[in-house]
Curated annotation (Swiss-Prot):
Has antibiotic, anti-fungi and antiviral activity. Belongs to the alpha-defensin family. Residues 20-62 form a propeptide. InterPro entries: Alpha-defensin (IPR016327), Alpha-defensin_C (IPR006081), Alpha-defensin_N (IPR002366), Beta/alpha-defensin_C (IPR006080). It is found in: Secreted. Pfam families: Defensin_1, Defensin_propep. Bone marrow. This is Neutrophil cationic peptide 1 type B. The keyword Glycoprotein does not apply. One of its GO terms (biological process) is defense response to virus.
Length: 93
């Protein structure tokens, strides 16, 4: 049960680190707006404690997960969705 809050905190920190700072008023008039067709990817890594069933079953020590606008590619599998700044992303592990 401690894994879910830890995972949520890692996800939040990753998404906050990738967020762009707000432009200043002077910078806003000089820059062009980017299109919405960019592929956004967030990489998240989390590890289970040694005593969990994943470790007992012989699974790897860590799992790497991403939130992407595309479909999951091998070896990742879709496990759900990520929502950031009112956009829905595919959550792949």
């Amino acid at each position: 049960m401690r894994t879910v809050p830890l995972f949520a905190a890692c996800l939040l920190l990753t998404l906050m680190a990738q967020a762009e700072p707000l432009p200043r008023a002077a910078d806003h008039s000089d820059t062009k707006m980017k299109g919405d067709r960019e592929d956004h990817v967030a990489v998240i890594s989390f590890w289970e404690e040694e005593s969990t069933s994943l470790q007992d079953a012989g699974a790897g020590a860590g799992r790497r997960c991403i939130c992407t606008t595309r479909t999951c590619r091998f070896p990742y599998r879709r496990l759900g969705t990520c929502i950031f700044q009112n956009r829905v992303y595919t959550f792949c592990c």
